[in-house]
Amino acid sequence: MNYTIQRISTEQDIEKCNLFEINNYQWKNVYKPKTYGYAGYLEGKGIYVKFICEESNPKREYTKDRDSVCLDSTVEIFMAFPEKGEKLSNDVMYINFEMNSNGVMYSKYGKGRKGRTFISEELCAKSNCKSVIGEDKWEITVTIPEELLREICDFDSILNGETFYCNFYKIAESPEVEHYGTFSPIENETPNFHLPIYFAQANIEK
């Protein structure tokens, strides 16, 4: 599976980008909300992502960044960046951005699942996560700051077409609304989104 991130000049162009659909529902699912979105590269700013979830009255109890938003109804983007010559594994550098419909983020980076680091408050502000809740759907927009990407990977190589890896998710871990949706399927017996070996190949168009 592959996903190409197109270059855009403004946030308003995001829906001209390639569509991703989160339509693989795995493990336990009380329901399966239709979720999809777009990702584009804004030069000098970062990777801009828009999610649309066709879900009314989404669970949204958490109101502060770094809260455990995965217990709410949440959309997520994970991106993995193996170093040059490094084989893709579950211990490569990757980021996870998780957002509930309050526009609250839980965002970390690091190698592997243990010992991960929260992004700084400054970068969190630059991510400019925004939510819009409608009657029968809700939307999230967020920017993965270029400053962060340059800190954790050789981003110039990425801009020149080097492959990295990504996955998009829809999740709620609370039992009354529990569900687990993926863009690229995860081959694991129990819910676990922190497995880069199952991410889709990705690139930014030159």
Where do the protein language model's features map onto the residues?
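Structural preference for beta-rich elements and adjacent junctions enriched in aromatics
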Residues: 1-206
